């Protein structure tokens, strides 16, 4: 669920069906009306951009391109070649929490050696933790942390010739506001897609 391909989309409410270009393909029983104009009832277009392998959508056609908004993040993450990473599995979780608290928690790794001492914190030292500065007009924040060279995960595969030196065992944690958060490691990537389920 949440991925794949199709040639059409069908609304689960009235069963109107749209082609992937947004044109209305079918609308059951609407031929019985005298004002139905299929050509005028397509989906509204949404601007879509691909940045570093991620698909970003915006309803605001006047907003600057994603690559411009995230320009100072690009040199930090492009060395990983994340656009070549592949999905291995997905999970869905429901948490009884305020999504903003989850975002705040994700944006700092100061807690890792304590709260996650049996997992990622076991191969991480606060002294090596670095944070990128967030300017007034920034649309993102990031931090990166270097794991010990003997860490069981988070290290580049021997055949990886993109990453050199300390970057072979350094992970980056970007947060693109308001809710795109992920861990980009030399050997894997995982992300959170937050969808608040009420107020």
PLM region spans:
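Rieske [2Fe-2S] iron-sulfur-binding domain
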Residues: 1-61, 67-75
């Amino acid at each position: 669920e949440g991925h794949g391909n199709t040639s059409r989309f069908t609304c689960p409410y009235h069963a109107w069906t749209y082609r992937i270009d947004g044109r209305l393909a079918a609308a059951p029983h609407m031929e019985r009306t005298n004002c139905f104009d299929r050509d005028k009832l397509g989906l509204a277009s949404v601007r879509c951009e691909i940045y570093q392998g991620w698909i970003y959508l915006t309803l605001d056609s006047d907003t600057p391109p994603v690559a411009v908004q995230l320009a100072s993040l690009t040199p930090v993450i492009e060395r990983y070649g994340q656009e070549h990473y592949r999905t291995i599995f997905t999970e869905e979780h429901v948490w009884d929490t305020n999504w903003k608290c989850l975002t705040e928690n994700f944006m700092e790794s100061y807690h890792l050696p304590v709260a996650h001492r049996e997992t990622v914190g076991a191969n991480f030292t606060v002294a090596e933790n670095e944070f990128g500065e967030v300017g007034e007009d920034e649309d993102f924040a990031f931090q990166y942390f270097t794991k010990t060279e003997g860490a069981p995960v988070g290290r580049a595969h021997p055949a990886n010739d993109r990453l050199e030196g300390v970057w072979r065992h350094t992970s980056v944690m970007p947060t693109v506001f308001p809710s795109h958060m992920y861990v980009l490691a030399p050997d894997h990537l995982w992300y959170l897609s937050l969808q608040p389920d009420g107020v």
